[in-house]
Each structure stands twice: as structure tokens, then as C-alpha cells.
Amino acid sequence: MAERLTGKPVADAIKEELKGRVADLKAKGIVPKLGIVRVGARPDDLYYEGGAKKTCESIGMDYEVFEYPQDIDQESFEKAIIEIGAKKDIHGILMFSPLPKHLNERKIRSLIPVEKDVDSLTLGSAGKVFADDPTGFPPCTPTAVMEILKYYNIPLEGKRAVVLGRSLVVGKPAAILLLRENATVTICHSRTKNLPDVCREADILVAAVGRAKMVKEDYVKPGMVVIDVGINEDPDNPGKYCGDVDFDKVEPIVDKITPVPGGVGSVTTAVLCKHTVKACEILNGLV
């Protein structure tokens, strides 16, 4: 049976480190603060928001929720985002997406100040991540993947990493972050030929396609590390969730694997707070 790379100890270690950094900031009269922007009240957004609030509270960080009705118009929402971005006491901004279809999301994202964009919503942040600029913040989910690999001392240099999925939110930034650690990276997608064969070449497989239990036993090999980013409704167990990996079939074969739930997702709010604390330090000229 594979070793389960659970997220809780990773998140706990991040939060423990952040408590000290927040205390240092408070000693200077600075309180890091996250602004959470939400339109409507989707259950998934409310669930993540609850986790973010809890994490902020656990490390002594502040937060403020900016909630808007589902039918808010473009002009009003743009004005609201500009006002939030200008607040000196807000150091990081999380905006839930997708926004309602009548809103121009690309335009609204562009109004978030890059230095407060702690989940890589803007093109400016994406550019910084691509250019390895240390002041840029990658999306929280692929950063959580890297935090897990680091915590469990999984070597990356010279290793073959396959990223299954090419989204701007996970796949592409995950590939960039793996490249930073000198892994040799392949990105796979729906048009990749002989997909299971390509995935089997990996030492580390990152599954981020958003398809329940897509990764079967023919995608993996003994000795592999599997990081499952997916969170999907389980087709075999109504009301429950599963990842992109068919856990029961893959776990007996591979060396290490993240569970769903309890894996990558449980680390993302800790990363969100870590990014916000760093943004606060940068904005106050402390790094």
C-alpha cells in the first residue's frame, strides 16, 4: 500500500510558521489582512470562505468579506474592486470565480492590484510567475502541490514530472513550479496521444483534469508519486467526493499518493494566508 501524503500536517506546519511572522508584523503595528470578494452565495465558495476565515483566525491574521448580489452590474462591481484594492489595510485579495456571465471577468480581474493578487488572478501575476519573479504569487492550488512535495521530502531535481491538465489555474503554473525545482516536465491534455503510456513515464504524476477517477492503474507504475488535485462528485458514491485518480485501483501500485478529500485541498487556505502575509511584508518594505 502506498504512503498517504495527507495535507493536514503540511497545513499545520505552514500555519505554525505564519504565526511567528504575523506576531513579528503585529509587533511593528502591522496586521496582515485578506479581502475576500464574493458575488452571490455558491455553496463551494462559502465552504472555501469558511476555511479561509478559520485559517486567518488561527494565525492571528485579519480578514474582511465583501459580498455582492448576483445581479450586480459591471460598473458597480468595477468600482467596488478598485475601492477594495486601494484600501491600505488590505494586503491580499481573493475573488471567487467564475463570476456571473453578465460580468466581464477578465476586465474585473485586471483591476486587482498585482501586489495584492495572492491567487494569481491577473495577467500581471501570471507574467511574474512565468518570469520567476519572487514578488509574484502563483495560484494557491499548485503552490499547495509544491508544499506537499517539499514537506514529505520528495526529490524533484532531475526527476520526470507529468502534469495531467493544462489549465491556467493548476496545470500550467504547476509545470512552471516543478521546472523551478529542476524537474523535467511534460504537460498532458485531451489531445495527448497514448496518454496512459506518457503518464507511466513519470516519477511524479500531478492529476488536474477535473474528471472523476480518470487515472486508472494503466496510468501508473511502482515507485511513482501521485498528487491528485481533482475534486469531483463521486459517480459511485452519491453525495461524496473523489479526485481525478481512481484511488482504490492506483494506491496498491504506487509509492506515495495524496487522498481526496484530505490532500491538496486541505493545504490551499494555508497557502492563501502565506501569500497574504508575504504580500503584507512586501507592501511594508520588510522583504
Curated annotation (Swiss-Prot):
Its EC number is 1.5.1.5, 3.5.4.9. It catalyses: (6R)-5,10-methylene-5,6,7,8-tetrahydrofolate + NADP(+) = (6R)-5,10-methenyltetrahydrofolate + NADPH; (6R)-5,10-methenyltetrahydrofolate + H2O = (6R)-10-formyltetrahydrofolate + H(+). One of its GO terms (biological process) is purine nucleotide biosynthetic process. One of its GO terms (cellular component) is cytosol. The keyword Nucleotide-binding does not apply. NADP(+) binds at residues 165-167, 190, 231. It comes from the Bacteria. GO terms for molecular function: methenyltetrahydrofolate cyclohydrolase activity; methylenetetrahydrofolate dehydrogenase (NADP+) activity. Pathway: One-carbon metabolism; tetrahydrofolate interconversion. Keywords: Amino-acid biosynthesis, Histidine biosynthesis, Hydrolase, Methionine biosynthesis, Multifunctional enzyme, NADP, One-carbon metabolism, Oxidoreductase, Purine biosynthesis. Pfam families: THF_DHG_CYH (PF00763), THF_DHG_CYH_C (PF02882). Belongs to the tetrahydrofolate dehydrogenase/cyclohydrolase family. Homodimer. Catalyzes the oxidation of 5,10-methylenetetrahydrofolate to 5,10-methenyltetrahydrofolate and then the hydrolysis of 5,10-methenyltetrahydrofolate to 10-formyltetrahydrofolate. This is Bifunctional protein FolD. The lineage of its organism: Bacteria, Bacillati, Bacillota, Clostridia, Thermoanaerobacterales. The gene is folD.
